[in-house]
Amino acid sequence: MQLLSPAFAYGAPIPKKYTCQGAGISPPLTFVDVPGAAQSLALIVEDPDVPKEIRSDGLWIHWIVYNLSTTITNLAEGAEIFAVQGLNTSGKPVYEGPCPPDKQHRYFFTLFALDVVLPEEENVTRDQLYEAMEFHIIEQAELMGTYEKS
């Protein structure tokens, strides 16, 4: 399975339009070779480079989406999501564009193929989603982009 974006390659800068300095819309994503046994998909976008004085765990969650249909092969930029969105670190169930406070940060987009459709819960956090996905991840794929404020 692969997670790709026509907007940026793995390790490349994320275009400004997908950040807090632009429109702040979600980037286009493409899902390739999703396993046939998958019953649903989940997506987590996170920044592990947050200064410890801002977040003690050094992690900022930008987007959580789960129970995406396995028939979906892509998400257009700024796409309306027909799945469940969990809470980002700001406490909102939406995409929050990169907005590093200090230097260039890495942003990991991780796609999970699951062997179940997860129970739909309100206000799911990253940790709760990982707990729900435990023992159900068939495969995962990662796309990493970078961003530094100009």
Curated annotation (Swiss-Prot):
CDD domains on file: PEBP_bact_arch
NCBIfam families, A to Z: YbhB/YbcL family Raf kinase inhibitor-like protein
SUPFAM superfamilies: PEBP-like
Coiled-coil intervals, chain numbering: none
Tree of life domain: Bacteria
UniProt record similarity statement: Belongs to the UPF0098 family.
Pfam families: PBP
Protein known as: UPF0098 protein CPn_0877/CP_0992/CPj0877/CpB0906
